[in-house]
Amino acid sequence: MSEAKSSQPDPAPEQPKPFVAPCHDRPPSATLQWLRDGWRDYRAAPGLSIAWGTFCMLLSWSVAWMAWRVGGWVLLLSLLSGFVFVAPLLAFGMYSISRKLCMGRTPTFAGTLRAVRRPIANSLVFALVLLVIFLIWARAASMVHIFFPSTGTLHLREMAVYLGVGSAVGACFAYACFAASVFSLPFIANRDVDVITAVVSSVNAVLRNRWTMFAWAVIVATLTGVGFMTGMIGFIVIMPWLGYATWHGYRDSLDVDGWDVLPAHHD
């Protein structure tokens, strides 16, 4: 007598994830709401915000001091210009704070450190990408040096050409880095997603909402400049605030429901 086979339905095949996260259209005025939401998070977790901001300030001081001791003002300006390439990686802990607050939970310092370590593999890959961009930028900056006036007397017109070309080249690399990182890192911090999908989704959001994201880039650059003008003391407030605001911009701009949420009980 043959044994009856169990009639269990076959498990449904896993739905393939899209290559890029859908993007919502957002007006330039949305950036002001992101800033308001970011400031609300800063006030909701002032101790953690000040701690992370102080860390950014001390790190910036250390880099500036070493650059000045080793290479003088030329290396100092180069490293400060390259700050835009590494600053996004400092924001993982801040994304964790906003993530917890959005869930109605209380963030802790230990939890933010664990959240920074969790996507370490994707972070290292992204850091490698930023390093490549930074090295290309450094090479381009050295090539721009040919526009530096070679005569003993510096004329305003010659300096204007040099500064204009250098600023244009730096702005192109900075905006490319901005497009790749602005929403990809919050995406990685929040969902089970690979680096390529996160970066493509971020670039797509920048291209689709070009004026909104241009306005956001101007805001980020302006506030970062204010931080430098205060001897980097302003980073205590500015860096966490921008990190939180970027998190809310990511949630407002990308539809990431197609990817699994990373567990929050280890944050």
Residue ranges of each PLM-predicted region?
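Hydrophobic alpha-helical membrane segments
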Residues: 1-267
